């Protein structure tokens, strides 16, 4: 099932932020920046990606975690959450 773009705006915003952070990390590597600075930015980008994933899962639970009959499918929900681990 496809989610509406408006439902995923928060996740998209986080992904765009992470994209900027990743580009910044690449630039820092090219410039030979200190590894401590790199690790700080890597941590921030990783957190942004993780939160975007959780936002997508939370938004999609009502859509993706239900059977065609409209009943909750626990296995689908667990699989979606475990994919983020």
Q: Model-predicted segments: where are they?
A:
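Solvent-exposed interaction patches of small proteins and small membrane subunits
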Residues: 1-85
């Amino acid at each position: 099932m496809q989610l509406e773009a408006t439902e995923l705006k928060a996740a998209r915003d986080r992904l765009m932020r992470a994209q900027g952070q990743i580009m910044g990390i690449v630039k820092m590597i090219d410039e030979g920046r200190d590894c401590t600075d790199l690790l700080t930015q890597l941590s921030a980008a990783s957190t942004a990606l993780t939160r975007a994933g959780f936002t997508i899962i939370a938004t999609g639970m009502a859509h993706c975690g239900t059977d065609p009959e409209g009943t909750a499918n626990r296995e689908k929900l667990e699989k979606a959450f475990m994919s983020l681990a």
